[in-house]
């Protein structure tokens, strides 16, 4: 985007900020379910740096979301004021502090607008090329607010009976609901994926209570098909479908109408879950899981071919350093994340993204290497979840399928190191050593297959390791 004006921030901060907000929205009746892993926030105090040599005088106007100043060759200026720059070399340092959100800046025009040459640093730590998103190119925008788009929805059916009023929107949606009322006593509003769920007032997981006398109210966007209002109520209900501004590029049709309908339903379901990040589900959990996201990256290539939502998800999943545990607390989900960076480069060829995320890729890879046993196999600790699948597997000790995934993740990390101009030979060497040990520890000649683990002595065989061996 070079000199195209856009909002810029410390790389990964936009994603961490919106991940923080997203993971605090899972509501069940009158309480909230919190994510079961550490959730990180953006840095709130950031410096932005730019050195430029101008061949002619020009003006510099910096807008910011937050407090701070614009430093030009050591002299400080306020935000929003045009600063004259003479021809020659200038050192620009912009400081932005925002206690309640994402610190970011916007250069309105000229040679300093856009992303080219700008780096950022949270006062301490690594100075990196700035982060940005093609979604934020206008000065009036605030990257603290995600730019969803909205479409009005009408119920396909309204059913009134002695129990209340049921609004049916025909299919699952993710929408915000507005109510307007006059002289209305206290009101209950239930949301459900099925009619049964919506009508079950005492058990409905998504329920709102509207105080008596309320003239209008807006409920946060959530997943539902049905809205049920018990009892008699005189109100005007308005619904707006909330979605991410993604362009659908993939299309499918065939002579089999049912197959076409299945594809379109799958595409719509995926659209519902393509929000700030790829979600595992729009109602439960409404969280971002690395294993689910890994599958979403593949699907996205056939439906959107949009790198931005993939990169947002990867930044959000990775979090900040120092690492406290595996991503989503699951060992294999850390490995899928490492794989996803290399595969993303193979898809989109975005070298700048690989270089920007490299420090966090490196620290996650090192974190995994620190959690290996004497043979070099990756093992789960007491606080780790060794998942791989819900299937009944022998997970006592190093898991064969996980070692295969670990080897491929190390190879991917080594490849990404090369792309970032770094030395990844240690990762490649460890992967090679493990490859040579796999058959010795995990292959059962008598069974003609790979076993789950050697530690228990049970020599149990499931399909996972053997499928991974083929892949």
Spans of model-derived segments:
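Extracellular/oxidizing-compartment recognition motifs
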Residues: 1-276, 309-310, 352
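Active-site acid/base region of carbohydrate-active enzymes
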Residues: 236-238, 245-265, 271, 278-295, ...
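Conserved, well-structured interaction surfaces
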Residues: 323-326
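A generic structural signal for solvent-exposed, polar alpha-helical segments
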Residues: 13-15, 49, 124, 138, ...
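Non-transmembrane amphipathic alpha-helical segments
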Residues: 407-410, 414
């Amino acid at each position: 985007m070079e000199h195209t004006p856009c909002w810029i921030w410390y790389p990964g901060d936009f994603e961490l900020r919106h991940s923080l907000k997203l993971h605090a929205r899972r509501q069940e009746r009158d309480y909230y379910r919190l994510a079961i892993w550490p959730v990180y926030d953006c840095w709130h105090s950031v410096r932005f740096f730019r050195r430029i040599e101008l061949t002619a005088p020009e003006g510099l106007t910096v807008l910011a979301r937050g407090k701070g100043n614009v430093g030009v060759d050591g002299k400080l200026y306020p935000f929003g004021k045009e600063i004259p720059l003479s021809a020659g070399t200038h050192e620009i340092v912009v400081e932005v502090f925002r206690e309640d959100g994402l610190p970011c800046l916007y250069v309105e025009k000229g040679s300093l607008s856009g992303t080219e040459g700008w780096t950022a640093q949270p006062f301490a730590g690594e100075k990196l090329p700035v982060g940005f998103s093609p979604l934020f190119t206008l000065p009036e925008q605030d990257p603290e607010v995600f730019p969803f788009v909205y479409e009005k929805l009408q119920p396909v059916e309204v059913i009134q009976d002695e129990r209340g009023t049921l609004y049916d929107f025909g299919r699952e949606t993710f929408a915000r609901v507005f109510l307007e009322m006059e002289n209305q006593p206290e009101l209950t509003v239930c949301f459900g994926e099925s009619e049964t769920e919506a009508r079950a007032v005492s058990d409905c997981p998504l329920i709102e209570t509207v105080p008596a006398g309320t003239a209008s109210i807006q409920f946060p966007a959530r997943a539902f098909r049905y809205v049920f209002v018990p009892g008699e109520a005189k109100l005007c209900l308005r619904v707006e479908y909330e979605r991410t501004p993604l362009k659908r590029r993939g299309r499918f049709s065939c002579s089999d109408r049912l197959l076409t309908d299945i594809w379109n339903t799958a595409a719509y379901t995926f659209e519902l879950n393509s929000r700030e990040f790829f979600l595992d589900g729009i109602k439960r959990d409404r969280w971002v899981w690395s294993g689910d996201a890994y599958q979403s990256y593949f699907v996205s290539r056939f439906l959107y071919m949009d790198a931005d939502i993939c990169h947002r998800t990867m930044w959000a999943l990775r979090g900040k350093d120092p690492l406290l545990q595996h991503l989503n607390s699951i060992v294999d989900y850390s490995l899928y994340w490492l794989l996803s960076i290399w595969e993303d480069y193979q898809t989109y060829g975005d070298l700048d993204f690989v270089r920007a995320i490299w420090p966090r890729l490196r620290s996650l890879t090192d974190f995994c290497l620190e959690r290996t046993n004497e043979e070099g196999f990756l093992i789960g600790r007491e606080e780790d979840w060794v998942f791989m699948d819900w299937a009944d597997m022998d997970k006592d000790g190093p898991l064969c399928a996980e070692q295969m995934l670990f080897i491929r993740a190390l190879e991917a990390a080594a490849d990404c190191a090369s792309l970032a101009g770094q030395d990844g030979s240690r990762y490649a060497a460890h992967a090679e050593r493990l490859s040579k040990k796999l058959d010795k520890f995990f292959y059962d000649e008598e069974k003609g297959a790979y076993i789950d683990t050697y530690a228990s002595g049970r020599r149990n065989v499931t399909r996972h390791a053997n499928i991974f061996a083929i892949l």
